[in-house]
Curated annotation (Swiss-Prot):
Organism of derivation: Enterobacter sp. (strain 638)
Complex and partners: Homodimer.
UniProt key word Oxidoreductase: yes
Enzyme class, UniProt record, top EC level: oxidoreductase
Record flagged with keyword NADP: yes
Record's comment describing the protein's domains: Possesses an unusual extended V-shaped dimeric structure with each monomer consisting of three distinct domains arranged along a curved 'spinal' alpha-helix. The N-terminal catalytic domain specifically recognizes the glutamate moiety of the substrate. The second domain is the NADPH-binding domain, and the third C-terminal domain is responsible for dimerization.
Name assigned to this protein: Glutamyl-tRNA reductase
Length: 418
């Protein structure tokens, strides 16, 4: 039995290829059935995200295994083998275990240390269990990887610092305001970055969110998801005074929030401080706003410096995380080897017990027929000894005939002779 991990990701393949190798949730069951129908595959898990498609497999060793699996992947997705072959990576046994642990821990992600991948790996594993996963070694590998990912999160700072603009904006807000549960946030725009910001704010239980956008329909979809109020861009001047935090990210070619607008808002707020985070390029907030007392303006460049600092911290944490992965993968492979030995021991013990039972039954039958107990017991002992040492004796003789001193030494040690 061999453990394999093969696939493509953002490092090895462009999005144009990655999107053609994905497995949709609707067809995943069919894909797993097809994969497990391959004669060499004993068990499998398919992980398919926007940045990676990977197969984790328990397989029987055979010639051309690599080619057979790539052929299956290409046939399933109607791809040219040459087109895919140069982008596929391949890990076996300890390397496969280490790879899965790194993936689950966020060490192989586009955004180093991102936590979402662990949920995606868990879902892939859960989907494979619905009548598909057949290899206990593979199941144990995934369970171990989940515990390793948790250990990495607990023992390192891999996920402690913001490394995305959206997350950095929210982190900044949480650093300045002791609790977001008492503040009102005005979000200007409704694009992807603002969507991420809104979700982060919801997770931190912000008191109230207002979304201002050029098109109400797009803003309303996001507002319904996060429980926010929607206003038009033209209403910002009137509502700015209600906001403790303003986070803006639009595609407007001109500033949306001017110095005069903020001055009026501060006057209405009796100079209670306002945090303005402008993550738009071109800028949504006039730079002069930063000169106003009680108006604290941060641009995307300010956030980028925070992100760069935090990324350096994550990279330092990743070194510690890699040490954890190396240790845990080594322990898992030791367990796997022990399991293999346990199976051999069970077979050997079962064989010996069968010999014992057969000879004991014959001895009991002889006793019931009135045979001499002493003779019967001596015969039983002699036959039992011969039967049990027959196979080791043949192995010793074969090693001696072949001049295999190393094998002789191993056999002697195994038999307790040295």
């Amino acid at each position: 039995m061999t453990l394999l991990a093969l696939g493509i990701n953002h490092k090895t393949a462009p999005v144009a290829l990655r999107e053609r190798v994905t497995f949709s949730p609707d067809t995943l069951d069919q894909a797993l059935d097809s994969l497990l129908a391959q004669p060499m595959v004993q068990g499998g898990v398919v992980l398919s995200t926007c940045n990676r498609t990977e197969l984790y497999l328990s397989v029987e060793e055979q010639d051309n295994l690599h080619e057979a699996l790539i052929r299956w992947l290409c046939e399933y997705h109607n791809l040219n083998e040459e087109e895919l072959r140069t982008s596929v990576y391949w890990h076996q046994d300890n390397d496969a275990v280490s790879h899965l642990m790194r993936v689950a821990s966020g060490l192989d992600s586009l955004v180093l240390g991102e936590p979402q991948i662990l949920g995606q790996v868990k879902k892939a594993f859960a989907d494979s269990q619905k009548g598909h996963l057949k290899a206990s070694e593979l199941e144990r590998m995934f369970q171990k990887s989940f515990s390793v990912a948790k250990r990495v999160r607990t023992e390192t700072d891999i996920g402690a610092s913001a490394v995305s603009v959206a997350f950095a904006a929210c982190t900044l807000a949480r650093q300045i305001f002791e609790s977001l549960s008492t503040v009102t946030v005005l979000l200007v725009g409704a694009g992807e970055t603002i969507e991420l910001v809104a979700r982060h704010l919801r997770e931190h239980k912000v008191k109230h969110m207002i979304i201002a956008n050029r098109t109400r329909e797009r803003a309303q979809v996001l507002a319904d998801e996060v429980g926010a109020e929607v206003i038009a861009l033209s209403d910002i001047d009137e509502r700015l005074k209600d906001a403790d935090i303003i986070i803006s990210s639009t595609a407007s070619p001109l500033p949306i929030i001017g110095k005069g607008m903020v001055e009026r808002a501060l006057k209405s707020r009796r100079n209670q401080p306002m945090l303005l985070v402008d993550i738009a390029v071109p800028r949504d907030v006039e730079p002069e706003v930063g000169k106003l007392a009680n108006a604290y303006l941060y641009s995307v460049d300010d956030l980028q410096s925070i992100i760069s600092h935090n990324l350096a911290q994550r990279k330092a944490a990743a070194v510690q995380a890699e040490t954890i992965v190396e240790q845990e993968s080594g322990e898992f492979m030791a367990w796997l080897r022990a399991q293999s030995a346990s199976e051999t021991i069970r077979e050997y013990r079962g064989q010996a017990e069968q010999v014992r039972d057969d000879l004991t039954a014959k001895a009991m039958a002889a006793l019931e027929q009135g045979g001499d107990p002493q003779v019967i017991m001596q015969d039983l002992a002699w036959k039992l000894t011969n039967r049990l040492i027959h196979a080791p004796t043949k192995s010793l003789q074969q090693a001696a005939r072949n001049g295999d001193d190393e094998r002789l030494t191993i056999l002697r040690n195994s038999l307790g002779l040295e």
